[in-house]
Amino acid sequence: QNAETQGRYLKTFTKHRESGILGTAYYEQKERQERVMTQKRIRDYGIMPGRIKTGKRNKITDVPGVRVGHCTVKEGEIHTGVTVILPGPDNAFLNPYTAAAYVHNGFGKSCGLIQIQELGTLETPIALTNTLNVGKVWDAVAEYVLRQCENDGAEALSINPVVGECNDSRINRISLRAIGAGQVKKAFDAAGEDPEEGDVGAGAGTICYGLKGGIGTSSRVIKVGEKEYTIGVLVQSNFGATEDLMVDGRPLGREILEKYGNEAEDPVKKTAFSEQDKGSIMSILATDLPVTDRQLTRIIRRLGVGIARTGAYTGHGSGEVMIGFTTANRVPTKGLRR
């Protein structure tokens, strides 16, 4: 009987693989895992930022329950994507997370921040994308939550999807608005505990300090009393003037310009070697500290200090938005009419 069952399984697997239904997803996951394993990070080059120990992966997903997924689109003039951050495995709408939002510089088009600031809760996953796709991604996240509630036998009459953005138009044909429900679904389906970094998802079209930007993440483990807690951060970086770039206290941006600036072709200088601090950076913080929304606000306001340590000065056109949530303090709403 086991042999017969196994035979049927293999036959079905082969059929799905040949049709592309199962094979494509399997190989995409395999390739993604291989890229994560071989991807170099700043510590691989001997640069050790900070003095507090990192989490196991040094990623936002070191906070238990948090997952991240990307969908990257690169076709012709399109270089963009979407990234989703899931705060936990269950339906956040029925059991919201204590959260906070802080706008360091408001040159941006993010959605959902006002209600977070007013109520101190997060009731949906957080999505990041490009500026002109905020509305389409908002709609896809709302649909995702509606389907969750339907499966849970709950009614959702008012939803607050949280969507952040950066303008990636310098290397992406942003007017094509390439991100929609299909790409958001792929990002949700790809969500896991060991996400890729760099030129992926919402970071596929971003530029940072005139160089290639992208998605970055890290984590730190702190001790309060006798108990350890984790703080993780994920950023979508798209800001900064090249000459201002600092790495571990070294004026690397100026060194790059002195060494390569005169050799670069004019189009490269215009696109890559930025003269102004403009763009944006979205910063998402997750923790398992049992803090209130007010305390979370105090924490995420410090993210601006970290950004400044890389050389930025919060230019006029640099939208700098911080969102934080804790997995420790939930605010149940099940049974309430929303």
Label each residue range with its predicted role.
Residues 4, 12, 21-29, 33:
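Short, positively charged and aromatic/hydrophobic N-terminal segments
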Residues 37-338:
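Alpha/propeptide regions of enzymes that mature by internal proteolysis
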